[in-house]
Amino acid sequence: MNLLLDTHAVLWWLSDDPTLSEAARVAISDPENTVYLSAVVIWEMRIKQGIGKLDLPDDFEEVVDGQAFSKLPVTVDHANAIVRLPAIHRDPFDRMLVAQAVVEEMTIVTRDRNIAEYGIDVVVA
């Protein structure tokens, strides 16, 4: 299974936060699954860090690079897919994650109920 991690799922995974569901932990740690980290997630984190809404460790890049995540860039196909999404979610970061999941046929690991309304596969974070 190809998994795409939502921002909170990444943060919970990296900090070993007990908020992350057992189903998500099993899916992320399963060597049969490929776990993707979108540039959108890093972008959102860095914006929040820059405005003081998120504290990240100084070695954040090294921590992320130490994970077995495959990196997913944003492509023109992803951007074009936004127009085909129903107006369920207003958050541009989440809409782009949904577009990426649709284009790349991925399952999103998220706690966001709005994302499930798009009819895509979700592992509850």
PLM feature segments, named:
Residues 1-37, 50-62, 104, 113, ...:
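Short, well-structured N-terminal submotif of metal-dependent ribonuclease cores
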Residues 37-38, 74:
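Short glycine/serine/threonine-enriched helix-capping/active-site loop
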Residues 45:
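Phosphate/NTP-binding elements of NTP-utilizing enzymes
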Residues 49-51, 85-86:
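Short, solvent-exposed loop/turn segments at secondary-structure boundaries
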Residues 57, 61, 66-114, 125:
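Active-site neighborhoods of divalent-metal-dependent phosphate/nucleic-acid chemistry enzymes
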